[in-house]
Amino acid sequence: MNRSSLLSIATAMALSGAAAAAQAPDSYATDLGRVYGGYQRMLAMKEACDTAVPATRAANDKAFAAWQAQHRTLVQDLQRRVTAMILAASTDKDDYVRNIGQYEGAILLQRKEYRDTLLGLGQEELREQCRRMPEALTGPGADLAQVYSAELATIRKRK
């Protein structure tokens, strides 16, 4: 696994699932990036709502905690796989330390950019999205296993 494959994780996170599917060939790294990016976008939405619409925080915290509990095993597996890819691309311990910082930083930057995009929406639009967040988190569009079933099939072919 090379560094460009790892970079595709951060790149794929910046793209919506449909855009990523249209622009990038299916591969383990790309699919991992899509699914992990979906998780990061959920975190960004929660952060944006907490910042811009604090009145929704209590309801969103409760709903988000339930959503995270539902996805805990999947998210832990994704995090393990991202870390394993970074380790495989590293030449030694020092290289791994540099790489982990670089790629985790890229992932956080993509999440921040998505959060900032959400914060740039009109106040009413964002307020409405934040108000509907508890309901949205229980819907099929928030079920990572359902939304990313094809990508997860590719990912799970590897141990």
Which ranges hold each PLM region?
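Bacterial N-terminal signal peptides that target proteins for export
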Residues: 1-9
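Short, intrinsically disordered low-complexity segments enriched in Ser/Thr with adjacent Pro
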Residues: 2, 16-18
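Immediate post-signal-peptide N-terminus of mature secreted/exported proteins
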Residues: 21-62
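Bacterial N-terminal signal peptides
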Residues: 8-16
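Compact alpha-helical subdomains of small soluble proteins
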Residues: 64-159
